[in-house]
Structures are given as structure tokens and as C-alpha cells.
């Protein structure tokens, strides 16, 4: 059951591959360079599963109302693999009845203009570009293989491809970040003028590299001071609409 609309459901499609593993991440993901041979068989299986979900939903009299392709990193797929997957979705579902169709395009080191065009062409109505921070030093420290400038370039490519609903994620409390650094990231995101900005606090699970290697975390007081900077979002006209809570 999705929301209060009767006989509807939401579809989540997970892509468990990443160009590198972020130090804070505890999600299931495979290294793209090491496990590239697994990607195409996985996409083939996903397409068969999409077809089966459609068949079962029709039997149950259910209508699809939202789609979310997340990960991992969905844009670790090639442009052709994205066409295959999103084409299968489009062939099986009436996208005119879908209220929101999101694809995470979070990593600029594997998101290019062609992939952004494919995502738009095949019906996505919302994408998420997730810098987490605009500090090159912090990006390197958490295992990202790209720069802050790469994020800006990716965002520009997304607008050129016609994407009109873009979310950007930031994380307060990343190792090596400071209150001033987080404020800079907030201001940079606001300057880009995306439709949504999502701020998370760093939440660590046992499977994250930060925990396993016992890396130093930011003090609670520093994280609290970072969150106080979120008044900048309200001043820029952003209004909260989403609440997510998670226990460590």
C-alpha cells in the first residue's frame, strides 16, 4: 500500500554497484572495477523481475504510483544498460500514472551527459545528485574519486539534459569536515538552486569503514553547530517536507 491511495504500490530498483565505496556507507554494494562482469547479468535479471512484478501486480489489481532507482550507484551502469533497464520499465508500466520517478545520479565520476539524457528520455521525473560535501579534502577522505568541480559540471549537464526536478544530498558530520566547511557546502548547494536539498546527519553502522577502522568522528557539538547552519535553507526559500529517523 502506497500512501493513502487505494490499490497502488511503489517500485524500488536497487543497483548494488559503485565506482568506490564511501567510508561511511554500510549498504550492500560491489566495486565496479572488480565486479564489472556481474553487471550485465544483474541487469538482465532485473529486467525479468520487472516483468514478473508487472504480471503479479496486474493479477492483484494494483497500479504503480512511484518508482525509485537507487543503490549503490545506478549510474554505474553503462548508458546502454540504463536504456535496457529503463526501457523495460517503460514497456511494462504506464508512466503517465506514475506520480514520481526518481533515479539517483549521485556520483559525478560515473554520471555523464549521455546517461543523464537517457534518464530523461526514458521517463524519470526527478534525479538526485549527491555531493555530500563540496570540500575536495573531505571528498578524498571519504573515498570519493571526484572533485567538487566535477559535481558542478554534473549539475550543469543535468540541466542541459532537461532535468527540472533535482535533489542534492549533503551530510553533516563527515570525517574531516568543519562547521565552516559544512556552511560552505550549504551555500554552494543553495547557489546552484536545485528543487530540493536534503541534509542528513552522519549515521554509522557496523559495516562502514569508519567504524571498522575506528576512525575519528566529529564531536556532537560540531555536528549540532553544523545543523544550526540549516537556517540558510529557510532563508533561501526552502521548506522542510521530509522526515527520516534512524537508530544507530
Residue ranges of predicted features:
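N-terminal [4Fe-4S]-dependent radical SAM core
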Residues: 1-11, 60
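Canonical Radical SAM [4Fe-4S] cluster-binding loop centered on the CxxxCxxC motif
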Residues: 8-43
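A generic secondary-structure signal marking the coil-to-beta-strand transition
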Residues: 9-11, 65, 193, 237
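Short, flexible loop/turn elements at secondary-structure junctions
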Residues: 17, 73, 107, 245-247
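Short loop/turn segments at secondary-structure transitions that flank enzyme active sites
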Residues: 19, 203-205, 247
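Conserved non-cysteine loop/helix-boundary elements of the Radical SAM core domain that shape
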Residues: 29-228
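C-terminal accessory regions of radical SAM enzymes
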Residues: 233-248
